Amino acid sequence: MENIKLACSLETNQTYIIAVSGGVDSMALLHYLVAQKIKLQVVHFNHLTNSNTWKNKELVKNYCLQNSLGFHYFELNCPQKNFQAQARLLRQQKLMQIAAKHRTPFILTAHHLDDLAETILQKISRSSTLLGYSGMQIQTSWTDFIFLKPFLYIPKAKIISYAAFYKIPFLEDYTNQKLTYQRNQIRHQVIPYLKTQTSFLQNIQKYQQTLLQAYNFIRKQTLLFLTKHTNHSCNQPNSIALAPFLNLDLVIQKDIILLLLEQKNITQSFIFIQNIIKGINNPYKPNLSWHLNSDWHLIKDYKHIKLMNPALPLPFALTKPLLCVSTCNLCLVCVCPLIETLNYNSQKVSFPLKVRLRQPKDTLKFSFGTKKLKKFLIEKKVPLTQRNNLWLVVDNLDNILFIPQLYTNLTLGNQFRIYLAFKNFFTSSNCFSQTN
C-alpha cells in the first residue's frame, strides 16, 4: 500500500479533536492517526435524517472503544431550509465546545482532494472572492480554534484503496447519492467527466495553491497599507485615509473592504462589494453610506473610509459642552486650550449666549453678505456624519456667533471683547478641513 502523505504535520504530544461520521473518509483518517499514535478525541454527529443513523453511531463508538479513544456524541435537529449550512455551523460549534473542554485548539476534518474540487466548482458557479475561489485551506482559524484538513490533497480513490487494504469498517451516507443537492450533482456528474478528460485533480491542487499564493500576497499588501494609513485617534477610530486608498490598485482596494467586513463577520455579495468600490472612487460623491447589516454602516467622507455603528453616538457629540465666557482670556486657559476671541458692539449681540446644535435653515453672516450654513460646511468639506452634530454658539436672538474650529462672526463690531471656551468639548485638528 502506497504511503499516505498528510497535507499538514501533526504532533504526537498534542491532542486533536476529530469529526468522524462513519464514512470511508473519516474512518480512514481515524485509522491512520491511531496508527501514528496521535492523541485523539472523537466527535460523532447524528443529523437525524433517517432511521439508520444509529448504525453509524455504533460503528464509530465501537471503534473508539477498541482503540481506547474518547467518544462524544451529538444529535443535531436542523431545519430543512438551508439544512447543510445550518448543520455545518452546529457541527463547528460542538467541535469547538469539545476542543475547549480538552484544552486544545486543534480540530480535524477528513476533507480530501475531491471535496476541494467540488467546493471550487461550486464557488465558481455562484461567484466568490479570491480566497473563496480557492475552495478550502489546509488550515483555517475560527476564534481561538484551528481547523485542519490533513487529507486535503489526497484523492478519494486513494482513501478508498487505503480503507480496503486495511479492512477499515465504514458506512456510506445514502444522502451523498441524492442529486437534489448541487454538490452531489457536481460529485457524480461533472467531476467524473472531467477526470476522464484531464489530470483534473492534480490541476485542481495547482489551481488552489496558485490562488492562495495570490491571495496571501494581496492580503499582505492590505495589512501593510492598513498599518500605515489607519487612524486610531479618538475622533476617527479605525478610519482609513481616503487619499492614499484611491491610489491603490483596485484589487487591493477590494481586499481592504473585504477585510473590514470579515472583521465584523459581515458577508456581502460580489456585486455589493463592486458597488462600494465604485462609490469610493467616484469623485463627485464625497459623502456616501452603505448599509451592511443592522449594526454597521460603511461611511465615505471627504478624508476617510470607516465602519460606523449608527446606534452609537458619534465621539464628537457625546455630551453638550459647557460654554464659558469671560473678559479675561487667562481665566479660560484651565477650561480649554482653544479660546476664541469675539469682538462685538452692544446693539449687535443680545445676551445671554446659548449653545445648540445645527438647524436646517441656519445662516452665517460675513462682510460680503450671508451664506447658508449647509453650503459653508460643504465648502469646508465637513463630513456629512458630523454636520448635524455641530455645536453652535448663538445669542438670545439665535444669531450664530461662533462654531468651534470653523467660524467666527466678524460682522459684530469692535466696541467690546469677550473670550469663549467650551468645557468638555471634543476637539481634534483632524475633525475638519482647515481650508479658508
Curated annotation (Swiss-Prot):
InterPro entries: Lysidine-tRNA-synth_C, Rossmann-like_a/b/a_fold, TilS/TtcA_N, tRNA_Ile_lys_synt, tRNA_Ile_lys_synt_N. Belongs to the tRNA(Ile)-lysidine synthase family. Ligates lysine onto the cytidine present at position 34 of the AUA codon-specific tRNA(Ile) that contains the anticodon CAU, in an ATP-dependent manner. Cytidine is converted to lysidine, thus changing the amino acid specificity of the tRNA from methionine to isoleucine. It comes from Aster yellows witches'-broom phytoplasma (strain AYWB). Keywords: ATP-binding, Cytoplasm, Ligase, Nucleotide-binding, tRNA processing. It holds the Pfam family ATP_bind_3. GO terms for molecular function: ATP binding; tRNA(Ile)-lysidine synthase activity. It comes from the Bacteria. Coiled coil: none annotated. The keyword Transmembrane does not apply. It catalyses: cytidine(34) in tRNA(Ile2) + L-lysine + ATP = lysidine(34) in tRNA(Ile2) + AMP + diphosphate + H(+). Its EC number is 6.3.4.19. This is tRNA(Ile)-lysidine synthase. GO terms for cellular component: cytoplasm. It is an enzyme of class 6 (ligase). ATP binds at residues 21-26. The gene is tilS. The lineage of its organism: Bacteria, Bacillati, Mycoplasmatota, Mollicutes, Acholeplasmatales. SUPFAM superfamilies: Adenine nucleotide alpha hydrolases-like, PheT/TilS domain.
